[in-house]
Amino acid sequence: MAPYSLLVSRLQKALGARQYHVASVLCQRAKVAMSHFEPNEYIRYDLLEKNINIVRKRLNRPLTLSEKIVYGHLDDPANQEIERGKTYLRLRPDRVAMQDATAQMAMLQFISSGLPKVAVPSTIHCDHLIEAQLGGEKDLRRAKDINQEVYNFLATAGAKYGVGFWRPGSGIIHQIILENYAYPGVLLIGTDSHTPNGGGLGGICIGVGGADAVDVMAGIPWELKCPKVIGVKLTGSLSGWTSPKDVILKVAGILTVKGGTGAIVEYHGPGVDSISCTGMATICNMGAEIGATTSVFPYNHRMKKYLSKTGRADIANLADEFKDHLVPDSGCHYDQLIEINLSELKPHINGPFTPDLAHPVAEVGSVAEKEGWPLDIRVGLIGSCTNSSYEDMGRSAAVAKQALAHGLQCKSQFTITPGSEQIRATIERDGYAQILRDVGGIVLANACGPCIGQWDRKDIKKGEKNTIVTSYNRNFTGRNDANPETHAFVTSPEIVTALAIAGTLKFNPETDFLTGKDGKKFKLEAPDADELPRAEFDPGQDTYQHPPKDSSGQQVDVSPTSQRLQLLEPFDKWDGRDLEDLQILIKVKGKCTTDHISAAGPWLKFRGHLDNISNNLLIGAINVENGKANSVRNAVTQEFGPVPDTARYYKKHGIRWVVIGDENYGEGSSREHAALEPRHLGGRAIITKSFARIHETNLKKQGLLPLTFADPADYNKIHPVDKLTIKGLKDFAPGKPLTCIIKHPNGTQETILLNHTFNETQIEWFRAGSALNRMKELQK
C-alpha cells in the first residue's frame, strides 16, 4: 500500500475542485485502527467532522477544542439542545477503561444487565490492589496470591463479555491508556477520577462511576451536563527547575478544589509547544483536583512525536489531516480565562492536606516553620499516574546522579513507582532505575501503591506527626498511609528527589547548597533529560489478555460464600410517597471526600462485595456534633457508635436516613461505592451546600437524592438530632425545588427549599430505584 502522504496527494489530484475534505474520503480507503489491540475498531474522524459541521452551522460561532470533541460525539447533533452549564448532552464515547478496584462493581452491574457483549471497546487494568511493602516483584507476587479470586473474576468476565484485560504488573491505567489507547479527538470515559490524563494526547477523557461505564458498554448514550470551558492561555516556555507539574499546581492555587466544577479546562497559547506530551498529561491528570470535568491540550508536534514513538505513526498521520478539528477555532469564547507566563513560573509545592494550598518551593520552608509543620522529610515518593513518564524518571535520575557524584544519598526514604511495564523496562535498560536505586531508592511495582493508600508503612506509628513529599496528585488527610498526622505535599518528581536528598522542606534547589562527602559545598544544576527514549521503548513482559473471538463457553463464577465478591440485588423502587421523618445519620463538618465516605487502602479488597465494603461508610467524616470521626449518636439508643453500625441499626429497624454535608461533598475519587454504600444501608438523600460532579452523578445513578440548600446558610438550621421530611416528590420535575421540613426535638419546625440538578431521565432513575433498574425496565 502507498504511504499515507502519497495517497493524500493522489486523492487531491483526483478530487480536483470538488468540495470534499480529502481525509474524509481517504477514511473510506485507509482505515486506521484505534489501537493495535483492536484492529477492527477504527478511528472515525469522518464522523467527528460531520457532527462538528452540523453543530457549527447551528451555533454559528467559533468553537473551542473541548466543544469540537464533545459535540462531535453527540448522539443527535442536529437536534441536541446545547447550552453550556445548563443542558444535558447525550454522547457516544469511543471507549471505556476501568481499573480493578472499580471494575469489579462495574462488571457486576453489567452482568446484572443481562447483555451478552460490550458495545464499545473496553478494557480492565489491574493497578489498585497491589500493596507497596517490600519492593516490585515481591509485592507483585504477594498481590497475585492475595487477590487471585478478584483477578480471576475480572479476567473471566472480560473474556466472557469482550473486554480486554491488563494483568497485574502491567502498570497504572492512565499510563497504559496514554501509551496504547488515547488519541487526539477521542472521547473516552474511565472509572477513575484521573482519567483526564488522556487530555495530554488531545482527547476528552472523563472520570465516571461504574454505572456510567455500564451504560456506555451497553450501547446507551451517555449523559453529561454541557460543560463550561475555562481557558488557560500559556505564554513563554518552561525552563530550569520549572516543570509541567508546576503549571497545574499554580492553576490549583488559583481555582481551588472546586473552581473547575462543571467545566473543561482547555490549555492553549504559544507556551503549549514547550511542554512534552507526557507533561501535558501530567497537567490534565491533576485537573481532577480542581473539580474539572476534564482538561485538554490541542494537537501539536509533541503529541505527534509521542504517537510515533509508541508505534502509532498512522494515527499521527491521520490526525495531521484532520488537525483543524483537533485545535480550537480562532476567536472562540471561554467562560473564564487564566493566563500563565511559563517563563516567569516558579517551582511549586502544594499542601498539606489539600492539593490547592500552593506555595513556591522557595517559600514553603518558612511557611512550614510558621505553621508548625514538620520540616524533616521522612519519605520522598516519585511516580504515580501523574508523574511516571520516561521524562519524569530521566529528570529525577539527573538530579540523583549529581548527588552521587558528590558522594551523597537521600537523607529521606525514597521510593519510585514506574507508570507501566514499558516504562519500567525502558528505564532499566537506559540506566535510570539503577541511578535511582544507587541514591537510596526502592523501585516499587508498576501500580498505584502509596498514592492510593496501598502502602504498608513501617517507619512511623499512627498519630505521629511527620512530613512526606510526593509527585502524586492528591494529599487528603490520611490518604497515603492512613495516618491523619502525615503532612503530605505534592510537587514535581525532580523537586521530590532534590528534597529527599536534602531531607528538609527548607531546601530550595534553585538557590541552596548541599555539602558533599568531601565537605565541599555544591549546588544542584537544573535537571535535563530526553522527553522520549532515543531508542524505541522496551515493551517488557507481555501483560495483555485479548478477549477470545468465541466466548460462548466462558464461565464467570462468583461464590455465594465469597468475602471479596457479591452478586448485586436490585435496589427497591420509589414507593410513590414523600420521604417522611428521615433520621440524620451524620451532619458532616468541613471537607468530605470520597476517601472519607468510602476509604481505600485496606478496604480495596472488598470493592466487589457491597455488604462488606459498606462497613467503611463515612468512617473518615467528621461529625459536627462531637468533632470526631466515625462516632455518631444512635437516635434510638442515644449511644454513640461507628457510622456503619448505626446505619445498619437503622436499616434493620426500618428507619430511613439522610446525610447532611458541607461544600464540594464527594470530591476526589470516582469510586461509586461512596454512593452504593449509603443506598445499601438505607440512605435516601444527601443534602449539602454543593457536590463534586462525579459523586453527584453516582448518587443519582443509585436512586439517591443529591440535594443542595437553596440558601447555603440553611446548613446551620439543621441539628444532628432533628428529623427531616422531603416533600414534592410526586411532582418531581427538572428545575423545580423540593421542600424540606426540619422537625426539631422541641416540637418546632422550619421549612427550607432544596435544589437539585435532575433531568427527566435521571428522575426516572430515582423512580425505578436506580439507573440499572431503569435500564432493565426499558429492555422489557
Curated annotation (Swiss-Prot):
Its cofactor is [4Fe-4S] cluster. Catalyzes the isomerization of citrate to isocitrate via cis-aconitate. Forms covalent cross-links mediated by transglutaminase TGM2, between a glutamine and the epsilon-amino group of a lysine residue, forming homopolymers and heteropolymers. The modification Phosphoserine is found at S559, S670. The gene is ACO2. InterPro entries: Acnase/IPM_dHydase_lsu_aba_1/3 (IPR015931), Acoase/IPM_deHydtase_lsu_aba (IPR001030), Aconitase/3IPM_dehydase_swvl (IPR015928), Aconitase/IPM_isomerase (IPR050926), Aconitase_4Fe-4S_BS (IPR018136), Aconitase_4Fe-4S_dom (IPR036008), Aconitase_dom2 (IPR015932), Aconitase_mito-like (IPR006248). The modification N6-acetyllysine is found at K50, K138, K144, K233, K517, K523, K573, K605, K723, K730, K736, K743. Monomer. PROSITE patterns: ACONITASE_1, ACONITASE_2. Residues 1-27 form a transit peptide. GO terms for biological process: citrate metabolic process; tricarboxylic acid cycle. Residues 524-560 are annotated as: Disordered. GO terms for molecular function: 3 iron, 4 sulfur cluster binding; 4 iron, 4 sulfur cluster binding; aconitate hydratase activity; ferrous iron binding; iron ion binding. It is an enzyme of class 4 (lyase). This is Aconitate hydratase, mitochondrial. Pathway: Carbohydrate metabolism; tricarboxylic acid cycle; isocitrate from oxaloacetate: step 2/2. Its EC number is 4.2.1.3. The lineage of its organism: Eukaryota, Metazoa, Chordata, Craniata, Vertebrata. Residues 551-560 have a biased composition (Polar residues). Pfam families: Aconitase, Aconitase_C. GO terms for cellular component: cytosol; mitochondrion. [4Fe-4S] cluster binds at C385, C448, C451. NCBIfam families: aconitase_mito (TIGR01340), PRK07229.1 (NF005558). The modification N6-succinyllysine is found at residues 31, 50, 138, 144, 233, 411, 517, 523, 549, 573, 591, 605, 628, 689, 723, 730. Binds 1 [4Fe-4S] cluster per subunit. Binding of a [3Fe-4S] cluster leads to an inactive enzyme. It comes from the Eukaryota. It catalyses: citrate = D-threo-isocitrate. It is found in: Mitochondrion.
